Amino acid sequence: MQLNSTEISELIKQRIAQFNVVSEAHNEGTIVSVSDGIIRVHGLADVMQGEMISLPGNRYAIALNLERDSVGAVVMGPYADLAEGMKVKCTGRILEVPVGRGLLGRVVNTLGAPIDGKGALDHDGFSAVEAIAPGVIERQSVDEPVQTGYKSVDAMIPIGRGQRELIIGDRQTGKTALAIDAIINQRDSGIKCVYVAIGQKASTISNVVRKLEEHGALENTIVVVATASESAALQYLAPYAGCAMGEYFRDRGEDALIIYDDLSKQAVAYRQISLLLRRPPGREAYPGDVFYLHSRLLERASRVNADYVEAFTKGEVKGKTGSLTALPIIETQAGDVSAFVPTNVISITDGQIFLESNLFNAGIRPAVNPGISVSRVGGAAQTKIMKKLSGGIRTALAQYRELAAFSQFASDLDDATRKQLSHGQKVTELLKQKQYAPMSVAQQSLVLFAAERGYLEDVELSKVGSFEAALLAYADREHGELLQQIDQTGAYNDEIEGKFKGILDTFKATQSW
């Protein structure tokens, strides 16, 4: 069989076309040192800041220090078996976590892996933990409320959808309790919740999850956990992972609420990583970029306009705005709000709820100090009825505090001052609320109306709590439709005012408290 030159060249071309070589270009490096969860790698020339580096044993590290002759990376997970000379590879990917509705009702770790024993996650894809916050043009002003269910917060320090409201106070002052009750109160509001637990005991987190389940709020919540026993890297990254999960709902025209419990521990974890990476320390040994650590996280909580949502969903969702509301928690030492991290976060957020240990120990719970607690944008989001009825509460408390301090030195007080002191004491008593007992807008409005219009004047101070409970039970039993109407509309007019007067007059006549 003879082949001419044309056939030979055709056969060679066919063979070349059929020849299939799979080649992957890996930027490979060598570990030169391992200590305290930090590895130094030589040879990763093309690595990006924040890139995942693949380690032996299906583990990853994140590149944080890019130096001339080596890369400093923090290991996510156990590192005891890593040694000098081991080979590592670039992945070309930034850290991503699973996102989607399938995560609701689940407990996951920083990397999005389930840790609740309920099987694999049903997710809608992955999202990078680090994302650029929406720009100025893509945002919309805050004008819808997030009801926490607490009278003192919803009346005096209202929170709006898309707001960042700091919860700050010493340890054991009820910060987590306030945040958990805010989640429980969203059961029927349509707001999806994310609870990020940073550096807490596993037993504490277990109690929180159980309480959410008992009150029917877990099915609406994603719990992201980085316990105290986990590495500093996972504690530092947990808030960003939770934020990415919350942004999934915001970008699709829905409302979400995220709790960071707490950012003080995240800052400590980041300080540990930075010092081990030999970055220069600053005030209180924190690195220079600790402000940026929190600002880039909290700026992602926002209210985005309908154009942003439509562009993101490629026209699938039209005419809907989305929001991510953040409630970061900061723990202070002996009430010192002028420390480095507290002042940073106060300057980033749109207001703060300050909880005081003195008030907490005096039995005033939630222990909100109305003097230095403020909401800078929430007032625009308050419902009409709450705005109308809550105006006098803050003033009454401020006057009461001033007079109470003055009255300690005065032996005889005139009737007007006595009356004001009595009113202030009763309002303070009225704002007390038990844990896991959030109140609806209508219930809060009725109670505030009673305080505002002087219905508590002839009620003994010790009977204020039982008066409130009996009033709400009576209103719910006899005027349930009116309360439902107020919850749905939030409106306030002469007709509702007249009905409230009628309810209180009839109830006071019964003397059943």
From Swiss-Prot:
It is found in: Cell inner membrane. GO terms for cellular component: plasma membrane; proton-transporting ATP synthase complex. It catalyses: ATP + H2O + 4 H(+)(in) = ADP + phosphate + 5 H(+)(out). Transmembrane segments: none annotated. The record marks S373 as: Required for activity. Its EC number is 7.1.2.2. The keyword DNA repair does not apply. The keyword Transport applies. Keywords: ATP synthesis, ATP-binding, Cell inner membrane, Cell membrane, CF(1), Hydrogen ion transport, Ion transport, Membrane, Nucleotide-binding, Translocase, Transport. Belongs to the ATPase alpha/beta chains family. NCBIfam families: atpA (TIGR00962), PRK13343.1 (NF009884). F-type ATPases have 2 components, CF(1) - the catalytic core - and CF(0) - the membrane proton channel. CF(1) has five subunits: alpha(3), beta(3), gamma(1), delta(1), epsilon(1). CF(0) has three main subunits: a(1), b(2) and c(9-12). The alpha and beta chains form an alternating ring which encloses part of the gamma chain. CF(1) is attached to CF(0) by a central stalk formed by the gamma and epsilon chains, while a peripheral stalk is formed by the delta and b chains. This is ATP synthase subunit alpha. It comes from Pectobacterium carotovorum subsp. carotovorum (strain PC1).
